[in-house]
Regions:
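ANL superfamily adenylate-forming
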Residues: 7, 151-196, 302-338, 568
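Conserved pre-ATP/AMP-binding loop-to-beta segment of ANL
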Residues: 56-59, 182-204, 211, 234-240
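Conserved AMP-binding/adenylate-forming core of the ANL superfamily
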Residues: 57-105, 109-113, 130-135, 219-220
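Conserved AMP-binding A3 loop
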Residues: 71-75, 200-226
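AMP-binding/adenylate-forming catalytic core of the ANL superfamily
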Residues: 129, 424, 429-430, 452-555
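Conserved AMP-binding/adenylation subdomain of ANL enzymes
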Residues: 223-240, 247-337, 346
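Conserved AMP-binding/adenylate-forming
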Residues: 288, 331-461, 467-470, 495
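Conserved C-terminal "lid"/linker of ANL adenylate-forming enzymes
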Residues: 471, 498-500, 546-590
Length: 590
């Protein structure tokens, strides 16, 4: 997974509130000693009370509302949280599990804060799951109530009458009723006691290789992560995040929501990727939280816009050359003023997670003046455990462990590659109702991630791939698919790739399923004049074969891709755009 934040930001207006990141301590001889002093919190209650009392007049959330834009201050959020808590208590839900499901919006965030800070256990659900899956998860989690957004009604039709259904469209009514109860003396929020170390958040993993499991996190798990990330990467009260990724994933929830709420910053909600460009201009974010596939497509769009301009490629090359001569992000953003304006004019940081970002996109964004920070984590680690920070960034690794988090490489081979294990306050309580699965991954307090990694000479870490996706050849040699995909996806003729071991005549063959970049292929084929469909297909195969041959040259012979599949349809993915490797492998082998 991947993180980003940086303090090189020039505000449009100087904020009235004092920045509470009061001091930076850095030992220049040891990147791992880079820390900020920040307030300690151990629960979402601490987070909610602290931020709402410290930054009452700051904008907490901003979003489209009809034809206009609505802003909600921290003071207003606090009033809504207390009122909604009173309402939920009146339904007998204290200490119960309450699910939240739907698109990113204020009501989703309000439900999360209210349940965690003043009611019970929150269960974020993926709105894109089937009705059967949602029914199963609600039953499995023993959810007592579900707050759902518009568009999710049909998936809840078969949910039993024992589960209270609360459409988010009725939120104004719930809050009004809660305020009435409070006016009569109800103090359910204030009287509720939060145990920071008990189950507080139940998250069902989407998984890329297997069945979903319920990850049990305590509020202290999440809050330790918020604090430890803030110690490495500064977020200020005048910052604004543009939230695009689904909030039910702990990555977006922690990095794109709670971390900004902790700092008194604001969160803007994007309702649709079709509106992404317009939302950049409308909301003017300083930070963009995204995944590689989204960032790479956005970067490709920017470069292609230049290419279509008269002399655009030359202009881009000259601007990049100028950019290399200056180190300050602000100066680089002025050189690329057109790009900067199209992204709202205030963007200076990009948070990228879930997989590795291509070197081309990484260096491209850096040349534009945006600070790109990379990190790693899983739902089970709340989620971040290793990351870049304000003292260190690189395109070649995932950075250093967070303060308070220990990592080790288990059973490394001759190249130093082994399974990454993590120990710290961010490690989950276990898998819900699944002690066997818990025992398989948590041993002696260490969480075994299932990811292969190595420690580099400078002390930073690099992820090599997943153990479950690793290809083991007949001679015992091992191939990491992600390593090959990394270089394939870097080529302009490749939109996306999936590498796996295909069983053929009793042997395992390294196989690459590749989705060509249609625009780049079409542009290349224009050079050959008019072509029949068959000729176009053959030329496309030749181009992709050449790309694979070039990538094969970067590796030892045993790692070379031996079989190529030209893919015409999209890969099966999770809602964070990660390829579901097991499903894809089974599909390709049918």
């Amino acid at each position: 997974m991947i993180m980003v934040f940086y303090a090189d930001f020039y505000p449009a207006e100087k904020p009235e509130e004092k920045i509470f990141f009061s001091e930076m301590e850095m030992n220049k001889n040891n990147f791992n000693n880079f820390v900020y002093n920040v307030p300690e919190i151990s629960s979402i209650r601490d987070l909610c009370d602290g931020s709402c009392e410290r930054f009452p007049k700051n904008t907490a959330f901003v979003f489209r509302d009809g034809d206009g834009v609505r802003e909600v201050t921290y003071e207003e959020v606090y009033d809504d949280v207390k009122a909604f808590a009173s309402y939920l208590h009146s339904l007998g839900l204290e200490g119960k599990k309450i699910a939240v499901m739907g698109r990113n919006c204020y009501e989703w965030a309000l439900t999360y804060l209210t349940v965690c800070a003043g009611v019970g256990v929150i269960v974020p659900l993926d709105k894109d799951l089937s009705a059967d899956d949602i029914r199963y998860l609600i039953d499995d989690s023993e959810t007592a109530a579900v707050v759902f957004m518009e568009g999710s009604e049909e998936k809840l039709v078969e949910i039993g009458d024992g589960v209270i259904k609360l459409p988010a469209s009725g939120m104004e009514k719930y809050i009004a009723e809660g305020k009435r109860l409070r006016s009569e003396g109800d103090r359910s929020y204030e009287n509720h006691r939060v145990d920071p170390h008990a189950l507080g958040i139940l998250l069902y993993t989407s998984g890329t290789t297997g069945v979903s499991k319920g990850v049990m996190l305590s509020q202290n798990n999440i809050c330790s992560n918020i604090v430890h990330v803030a110690r490495r990467t500064a977020v200020y009260p005048y910052d604004r995040a543009l939230s695009v990724l689904p909030l039910h994933h702990t990555y977006e929830c922690m990095a794109g929501f709670l971390s900004f709420f902790y700092a008194g910053a604001s969160i803007a909600y994007n309702n649709s990727l079709r509106q992404l460009q317009a939302d950049f201009v409308l909301f003017k974010p300083t930070v963009f939280v995204a995944v590689p596939v989204l960032l790479e497509k956005l970067y490709s769009m920017i470069v292609k816009k230049y290419a279509k301009m008269k002399g655009g490629k030359t202009v881009l090359a000259v601007q990049r050359s100028l950019s290399k001569l200056v180190s300050k992000g602000e100066a680089r953003r002025k050189i690329f003023a057109t790009v900067n304006a199209s992204l709202g004019g205030r963007l200076n940081r990009i948070l990228c997670g879930a997989a590795a970002l291509s070197p081309e996109a990484y260096h491209g964004y850096e040349s534009f003046g945006y600070r790109v920070y990379v990190g790693y984590g899983l739902t089970e680690t709340s989620p971040v455990c290793i990351m870049h920070h304000d003292g260190y960034r690189s395109a070649d690794d995932i950075g250093y462990p967070l303060v308070g988090v220990n990592v080790k490489i288990v059973d490394p081979n001759s190249d130093g590659v082994g399974e990454l294990a993590v120990k710290g306050p961010n490690v989950m309580l276990g898998y819900y109702k699944n002690p066997q699965a818990t025992a398989e991954v948590i041993r002696d307090g260490w969480f075994y991630t299932g990811d292969l990694a190595k420690r580099l000479e400078n002390g930073a870490y690099k992820i090599m791939g997943r153990i479950k996706s690793m290809i083991v050849l007949e001679n015992g040699k091992k191939v990491f698919p992600e390593e090959i995909e990394y270089y394939l996806n870097e080529n302009k003729f490749v939109s996306e790739s999936f590498v796996f071991g295909k069983e053929t005549d009793g042997a395992t063959v390294v196989t690459a399923s590749i989705i060509p970049d249609k625009e780049e292929i079409d542009e290349e084929l224009k050079k050959s004049g008019e072509l029949t469909d068959e000729e176009r297909e053959n030329r496309t195969k030749a181009i992709i074969t050449s790309v694979v041959s070039e990538v094969n040259g970067k590796f030892a012979a045993y790692k070379a891709v031996k079989k190529i599949i030209i893919r015409k349809s999209d890969f099966i993915k999770t809602t964070t755009h990660k390829i579901k490797r097991l499903e894809e492998k089974n599909k390709e082998e049918e």
